[in-house]
């Protein structure tokens, strides 16, 4: 979940 959130923020 944490990794996904980060990815979303970067995107």
From Swiss-Prot:
Keyword Hydrolase: yes
Role played: Serine protease which has antiviral activity against cucumber mosaic virus and tobacco mosaic virus.
Activity across pH: Optimum pH is 9.5. Active from pH 7.0 to 10.0.
EC number: 3.4.21.-
Comment on activity versus temperature: Thermostable. Optimum temperature is 40-50 degrees Celsius. Stable up to 60 degrees Celsius and retains 60% of activity at 4 degrees Celsius.
Organism name: Eisenia fetida
Entry keywords, A to Z: Antiviral protein, Hydrolase, Protease, Serine protease
UniProt-recorded name of the protein: Antiviral serine protease
Single GO BP term: regulation of defense response to virus
GO molecular function, one term: serine-type peptidase activity
Domain of life: Eukaryota
């Amino acid at each position: 979940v944490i990794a996904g959130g980060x990815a979303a923020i970067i995107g």
